[in-house]
Amino acid sequence: MRNRIHRKHREQCCLGVIEVKGNMSPIGLTTNVLIAHAEEFHGNTEIVGVNVKGERRRTSWGEVGARSRRLSSALVKMGLRQRDRVGTIAPNTCDHLELLYAISGFGGIAHTINPRLFPDEVVYIINHAGDKALFVDPAYVGILIGHRHLFETVENIYITGPKQNEVAARMNGFKFLVDLFETGDPAYEWPDLDEDDAAVVCYTSGTTGDPKGVLYSHKSIVVHASVVSLPDSFCLSATDTVMPVVPMFHVNAWGVPYASAMVGCRLVLPGPNLDGHSLIELMNRERVTMALAIPTIWEEVLEILRDAGASLESVKRILSGGTAVPSWMIKEFDQSHGVRLIHGWGMTETSPLGSVNSPLRKHLALDGDEKLEQMSSAGRPHWAMRLKIVDEEGTQLPNDGVSEGSLYVKGPTVVESYMSHEAPATDEDGWFDTGDVGTIDGDGFLTLTDRSKDLIKSGGEWISSILLEEIIRQHPLIHDAAVIGVNHKKWTERPIIIAQAVEDESPTETEVLSFFKDKVAKWQIPDAVVMVDELPLGSTGKPIKRVLREQYIDYLLEGNT
């Protein structure tokens, strides 16, 4: 066989320099490549979506792919261009799935917005992202009414789903997705895109209180999709029926919409009604084999199953993330329902999966408490993620399962910088400080023990203690205050206020908590107020939260509500 060498390479060879590069096709790793693959090779595989009324829409990867292309062309005809941001406020539905692919498919950036945020926060992130258009599910239209005049860049707002209340909608300046879809070209073909361009932006709570945008590139999304599909991750295949309970506005539903298109599994999208009864009925009727949700959801599901003497008829495994999973939950799913609970760790800045608890060969022989202990850790990193723990001086600590330090991560699915922030999010070597504290053992298994950043995770949602402190310190009767997260039976963690009153004042708990009204979302308001004579202060004059957490960690569990 004759060897063929590119002229450039021949010339370099003559100079004694050989440049060796791959000769593979330069097709980018982009999201429209994923949906094109699903449309062509998994076209008959069913997708089931539930709307706000509980009605089920049955479609397929073939139809979703075709509709996404047509909708993408409609967005371009509307005047949107590559790198324009397009906001979505919606639960997991077929419309939302099509929008996710349509927006990034032409080169736009899908901005999935959390409808649980306080309206002022929604306005802030829409303006910060510079969204040109918004798509909102009927379940969340109320969020936008009365705030549209505050949107600085939004030109059009569309309601998804079938037309309803058309007169009222148009009076508020809303249009309909179904009308926009009709303007699209069914013959539209996906363009070639740069895999390093942004495809999706999600916002995360920061310690300053203002949410920060994390831009996921096409390549990072495809890499993450391949990671979560692996046997030692979510173990997804074309034989599965997967239900992401975690919404798309939580880091792309943990990557499931992309991984599902990659492997061709059947997909069930549960819509906005995420109560335990609805989820159990949906999982059993649609024969779901894999589902993903936060521990609060799974605790409610277990309670209902326990009271009814029922079980999950087809589910083989579930993934739980967002907060730590108690060992009793792992045990009950396993022993009472034959369901394997997979515990994972991640964050918005890591796309989100950072580690997943998949056993090594030596763990297969474990049973009883030893098995539960192993399954309760945050797991080991996937191939695209590096972990390390460091001490206060930044020195890396050994992976011995004992040495405790701050957790840093690095990899192609880790944020490098936040949207519109000049400063990098990582150190000079590319390591990102997660704000978590923990240990790593010799096999790479991560155990989280604390959190160093001022964030509280309640029912899977982040609450900034800094934001709450900024508000309460403006109260005329409060001299100083600290907000900490404490244990909660249902929500895992809830904020409480430890406050010092102005001299000669004795504000009541009601007076303090009512100060948050119309300033933050109701679920962000602290559960209790503890008045103290004096707060423990550090050398900089700030309250020492570590001391307060140690003292009040079980305050709500002791009946102080």
Please provide the spans of the model-predicted regions.
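Conserved ANL (AMP-binding/adenylate-forming) active-site segment centered on the GW(Y/F)…HTG consensus within
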Residues: G338, E370-M375, T395, D400, ...
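Structural core segment of the AMP-binding/adenylate-forming
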Residues: R2-R4, L34-I35, K77-M78, G105-F181, ...
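Conserved beta-loop-beta connector loops within the AMP-binding
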Residues: P381-Y408, G442-D443, E505-E509, I544
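AMP-binding/adenylate-forming catalytic core of the ANL superfamily
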Residues: H96, L117, V123, L134-V136, ...
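Conserved AMP-binding/adenylation subdomain of ANL enzymes
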Residues: V222-T241, V251-T289, I304-L305
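Gly/Ser/Thr-rich phosphate-binding loop
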Residues: V288-A293, L302-E373, R386, E393, ...
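Conserved AMP-binding/adenylate-forming core of the ANL superfamily
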Residues: I47-T93, L97-Y101, F118-V123, L177-D179
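Conserved adenylate-forming
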Residues: L75-L80, D185-D196, V201-M243, G255, ...
